[in-house]
Amino acid sequence: MFSWRRGDCESQKEENRSEERKGEETIRFPTRSPFHCVLFLLTDGFVLHKPTASPTVGFSPTIFSFYYSRWESSHRISHDESGFCTAKTPLQDSTFTRHPSTSVPSSPSTPRHSGMDYHQSSSVASSESTASTVAAAAAAAAAASLNQHHHPHLYCDDGLLSRSLTDMVSSGGYDSSSSSLSAAASMCYPTPDAYYYHAPPPPPPPQAQQGFSSTDAWLQMQMQPTYHNFGSTVVSTNSPLPSHLLSYGGQPAFADPFYTIGQSTPNTSSFLDTSNSSFGAPSTVVANPMTNYQLAFQAKLGSLHSLIGDSVQSLTSDRMIDFLSNKEKYECVISIFHAKVAQKSYGNEKRFFCPPPCIYLIGQGWKLKKDRVAQLYKTLKASAQKDAAIENDPIHEQQATELVAYIGIGSDTSERQQLDFSTGKVRHPGDQRQDPNIYDYCAAKTLYISDSDKRKYFDLNAQFFYGCGMEIGGFVSQRIKVISKPSKKKQSMKNTDCKYLCIASGTKVALFNRLRSQTVSTRYLHVEGNAFHASSTKWGAFTIHLFDDERGLQETDNFAVRDGFVYYGSVVKLVDSVTGIALPRLRIRKVDKQQVILDASCSEEPVSQLHKCAFQMIDNELVYLCLSHDKIIQHQATAINEHRHQINDGAAWTIISTDKAEYRFFEAMGQVANPISPCPVVGSLEVDGHGEASRVELHGRDFKPNLKVWFGATPVETTFRSEESLHCSIPPVSQVRNEQTHWMFTNRTTGDVEVPISLVRDDGVVYSSGLTFSYKSLERHGPCRIVSNY
């Protein structure tokens, strides 16, 4: 066993500087794990100087040879003609000092590991030093053969190898003076020539795909991780990927006390940054003999879905009644808020979507779903542990039930952004104050569309799954129009894109302000705690109504509105779509270079997307809605003349139309094996015919043949016509309203029988439609059309 000389970095500073003047070079390498052992390269004439509180120990040169070849192949160390080694990027922490007098120059393509100069402590005999040099030379020859082999190699990260070395040393499983690789092999650890660390290959051209599964994302990573507690093997692509090993889109699911979740993301590793690489790089894996624990998990690979499949039953009326009585307790809601238009980025610029798309997870059903996933995972883990004992790992179980989400443009996976729904993230205090039913929230702040993308319209695609690999599915936004810049000319009402470019009464808008046009100073109008304020993180969707001046001259809670597009000079009412809180009546004015335009000619110009506007108080024409820091105040403008007012930056608001896509579901009969998506969305309901011959036609999207329509707690025969149309019969009132449901479906005011319409999948997943069917309306009006409020 070798013992390397240790020293204090501060005390060695002057010595190192003098050595450098003699032709030696210093290379710094980061260390994260606070091990009590020296775990780093000591070959090719390098000496380690690292402060440590415990006695240092040495390791076989076999393993260290791999470390050096790995650094060299990752282009962090290069050779010059004189045989010196240089680091391209100076790092920090541990210091390695090279002794060129003991080095043997070699070609740049071949790792050099001869002429090693080990500084040993006085406790080590000189004869052992000779044996160590021989062992190092043999190890160097083995490591040098790395470039001569073209067979697949395993990927190993720095944390794994450090733990492997620690286990080997503590167990005394090898002799440091041995020149063979059998010591490591006998310990069931991969030998150095089984590893290969390479630069990521160029990504293939993007391919459109319908779905985004967590398994596909893992297989597309350019560096496949090797798991410590699960053995040293990554399964081959011919066999299914163990979904229980997935965590955070493909990161190792084991618990590492020296690594945090935030240090590893789907496109970065804890050692080599590949943030500039695409997910589409092909992966290289090899199948080595598995450990008992891995074999046990491999045998149980399909057990998670089989456990779910055996327990799934068709939905019962009693369970449906329970769900309809306690929707807040059971239902999971995904709401995607976004702007209706997005500015295109040109060249190297990145115009991030403003306001940023926001995803809200609403309902206590999310906690119930997480608990179910955790229980299934524990059941599977207990099954796999029967043949392979392993200590319980609470951090591992927590990661297995963490919700992982990505969002991107369309089906393209190359520019996806991860959404932070982790348990340990810092929560905004306003989340619960605004709505106690909000489970989680996240904004996608770095999405943009480049000029190379020729699409005129696109949608956002959000993918959800759990760390154990249990997939929830993909959920899309409403359609978004791409624009080059805000329109400066008068919009024509004949324009086919008028509904996107102009703002109509009754639609939702967002308002934001930028001081001195700086992106970092963006503030959004938002409602929190029953009060308006300016937020840098959240934005509100406000319904803008055209106020009918002739019918309502006083400020009241109930006011008359009219349809049509919003023009400058119109009186509008802004109502928060979540809380219902409204601003007083305001007159919308056009803004040009911090001046409000009051010309009568502006009344003929409609308000367009991303226009700058001001909101003038009705009672005092010199007062405007304004923000000051995080507060909303009234700003006193300066009159330049009868046609213009001077305002400050805080009173100039940018207006943009917004939209929302909402999905509601509940796994009524327990966790299901298949993804929740595609989630059907019902847009409207039409009633055809009279009396007993009446039938209902549902219009929407993503309908499937395995869906059945339910009137309250009563299923009815359903005919699938297309993905946009379902037909069904109307059940008799006596069948819908019975002793159990009389109180639930009877309107106490009118006495009418009103039942909610739901779609139910054959495995018990309930999708709420947001529609209610009234039997009295059917008797009075016959055929009719009902539009969903979702």
Curated annotation (Swiss-Prot):
The record places domain IPT/TIG at 680-776
Which keywords, in A-to-Z order, does the entry hold?
DNA-binding, Notch signaling pathway, Nucleus, Transcription, Transcription regulation
Region annotation (DNA-binding) ranges: 343-353, 484-489, 514-519
Gene3D superfamilies associated with the record? 2.80.10.50, Immunoglobulins, LAG1, DNA binding domain
Gene Ontology biological-process annotations: cell fate determination; cell fate specification; cell projection morphogenesis; dauer exit; egg-laying behavior; germ-line stem cell division; negative regulation of transcription by RNA polymerase II; nematode larval development
**Quick one: a GO cellular component term?**
CSL-Notch-Mastermind transcription factor complex
| Signal peptide annotation | none
Please give the residue ranges the record annotates as the region Disordered: 1-27, 92-125
Phenotype of gene-disrupted mutants: RNAi-mediated knockdown ectopically up-regulates expression of hlh-6 outside pharyngeal gland cells.
Q: Where in the cell is it found?
A: Nucleus
Q: In which tissues is it expressed?
A: In young adults, expressed in germ cells in the distal most ~10 cell diameters of the progenitor zone (PZ), and also in late pachytene, diplotene and diakinesis of oogenesis.
Give one Pfam family.
TIG_SUH
Ranges of compositional bias, category Low complexity: 97-113
Gene Ontology molecular-function annotations: DNA-binding transcription activator activity, RNA polymerase II-specific; DNA-binding transcription factor activity, RNA polymerase II-specific; double-stranded DNA binding; Notch binding; RNA polymerase II cis-regulatory region sequence-specific DNA binding; sequence-specific DNA binding; transcription coactivator binding
Q: TM spans, by residue?
A: none
Function of the molecule: Transcriptional regulator that plays a central role in lin-12/Notch and glp-1/Notch signaling pathways, involved in cell-cell communication that regulate a broad spectrum of cell-fate determinations. Binds directly to the 5'-[A/G]TGGGAA-3' DNA consensus sequence, which is present in the regulatory region of several genes. Acts as a transcriptional repressor when it is not associated with Notch proteins.
Task: Describe its assembly.
Answer: Component of a complex consisting of at least a lin-12/Notch intracellular domain (NICD), lag-1, and lag-3. An NICD product of lin-12/Notch, including the RBP-j associated molecule (RAM) and ankyrin repeat (ANK) domains, interacts directly with lag-1.
Q: Which PANTHER family does this one have?
A: RECOMBINING BINDING PROTEIN SUPPRESSOR OF HAIRLESS
* Similarity annotation: Belongs to the Su(H) family.
Q: What is this protein called?
A: Suppressor of hairless protein homolog
